[in-house]
Amino acid sequence: MITKRIIPCLDVDMGRVVKGVNFVNLKDVGDPVEIAEFYNKEGADEIVFLDISATHEGRATMIDVVRKTAEKLFIPLTVGGGIKNINDFRDILRAGADKISVNSSAIRNPKLIKKAAECFGSQCVVVAIDGKKRKDKDGWNVFINGGRIDTGLDAIEWARKVEKLGAGEILLTSMDADGTKEGYDLEFTNEVSKTVNIPVIASGGCGKLKHFGEILKKSSADAALAASLFHFKELSIEEVKNYLKKEGFSVRL
C-alpha cells in the first residue's frame, strides 16, 4: 500500500506566511521559518513553500528565507514562486530545497520543465497547476500569476503535457475550492490524477478531518495539502494522521 502524505503549505508574501480565500483577502499568519520548524516537529511528510508574490511582482524568490527554512527541516522542502530559469532552479536547490515548483514560468516556457528534468532529475520538478472550472462547466482552465490570469489552457491537457516533458509531480489546486473549507475538489483531482502516472498533490478546500479521508479514498491523489487548517491550529498533523490510520490508510506516524 502506498503511504499517503500530509503536506502543510506556507504561502509567503513579502517574507510572511499568509492565507486567503479564493486567492484574495490575505491574512498574516506568521514567520515562515518558525512555522516550518513547528510542522517538521509535528510530523509533516513534506512542506511546500510558495512565494506567492514573487512571480507577480517580478522578484526573485527570497533565497535567504528558503535557506533559513531548509536548515530547520529534516523532511523534503518544495519551493516555488518566481522561478524563471535553470539558474533559479540551481540557486533554490543550493539553498536547501529538495524540489522546485513551477507554474507561470512553465506555461510561458514549457521547455523549462524538460531542461530542469534533464539537469536535476524529474524528482526535483513539480508543476503547480491552478485550475478553475470553465463558465460552461465543461472542464477546467489553467490560471497563472497567483490566479490573476486565465491562460485558456485546458488543465487536463496541460497535466498530460507536463508529464511528457518530465515533471515528477503535480501540485493541483482547485481555485473553486481554495479557502472555502468545504472539501477538496474531488471531480477535478480525480480527472487529473487518473490522466497522469506521476504523483498528484490535492490542494484547496480542506476544512475538516473527513475531507482528508475523502480525497485520498475517492481520488487517486497521492498526498493532501492544507494551509489554514494547520496555521490556525484547527487541526494538528498528528490528528489527521491518526484519523487516516484508523480509516485504513498507510501513513508515516
Swiss-Prot record:
Class of the enzyme per the UniProt entry, highest EC level: lyase
Keywords: Amino-acid biosynthesis, Cytoplasm, Histidine biosynthesis, Lyase
Primary localization: cytoplasm
GO cellular component, one term: cytoplasm
Pathway: Amino-acid biosynthesis; L-histidine biosynthesis; L-histidine from 5-phospho-alpha-D-ribose 1-diphosphate: step 5/9
E.C. no: 4.3.2.10
Residues annotated as catalytic: 11, 130
A single MF term (Gene Ontology): imidazoleglycerol-phosphate synthase activity
Top-level division of the source organism's lineage: Bacteria
Compartments in which it is found: Cytoplasm
Gene3D superfamilies: Aldolase class I
Entry-linked Pfam families: His_biosynth
InterPro entries: Aldolase_TIM (IPR013785), His_biosynth (IPR006062), HisF (IPR004651), IGPS_HisA/HisF (IPR050064), RibuloseP-bd_barrel (IPR011060)
One GO process term, biological-process aspect: L-histidine biosynthetic process
Catalytic activity line of the entry: 5-[(5-phospho-1-deoxy-D-ribulos-1-ylimino)methylamino]-1-(5-phospho-beta-D-ribosyl)imidazole-4-carboxamide + L-glutamine = D-erythro-1-(imidazol-4-yl)glycerol 3-phosphate + 5-amino-1-(5-phospho-beta-D-ribosyl)imidazole-4-carboxamide + L-glutamate + H(+)
Description of how the protein assembles with itself and partners: Heterodimer of HisH and HisF.
Alphabetical list of HAMAP family matching this protein: HisF
Its biological purpose: IGPS catalyzes the conversion of PRFAR and glutamine to IGP, AICAR and glutamate. The HisF subunit catalyzes the cyclization activity that produces IGP and AICAR from PRFAR using the ammonia provided by the HisH subunit.
Family: Belongs to the HisA/HisF family.
UniProt protein name: Imidazole glycerol phosphate synthase subunit HisF
Organism of provenance: Clostridium botulinum (strain 657 / Type Ba4)
